[in-house]
Amino acid sequence: SQAVRQFLPTNGTSNFTDISADKQLLVESITAKGAAIRDRFQVLKGVMLPTSAGIFSPEESVKRIDVAYSFVQSLGLQLKADSLTGTQVKVNFNGQVITLDDNNEIPSNLRGYVQLALNLNLINAYFGLAQGPYDLTPTMKASFKPDQIVSRGDFAVIATRTFNEWTKALGK
């Protein structure tokens, strides 16, 4: 459901020093500028980010923050996400707007991606109640857990939710 253009460097080299030849097409394609089919002018960043310059880290686990970035990026929403850089990520719970307790754990440049992923219901926030010893009523709390590893089952749910957003745009 998250269409990605195929890409290989035309000079025959690889942009990454840690991938094998059999993985080069996939890694180069998902990290290339303009990777998302939704990026009609091929100017946006890839749908996955390298872990550092020239390093993809193919054996590294994927975290919730990575998934939020990738799925929002695959929908072609980079400019909207970038416009939210540095803002406090918030969620709505029964009409109450709650700022995430773990905002400081979300890199400033990725907060817009998390905000959009939450707004589009691609990925969920975690909710809980907190009550001090003298508080008459509990307070609703929310967090994102950006560094939590995503299981295959979690990934399947998020991919399915992303498909719904993809098809909405096709009907316009």
Identify what each model region corresponds to.
Residues 1-172:
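N-terminal propeptides
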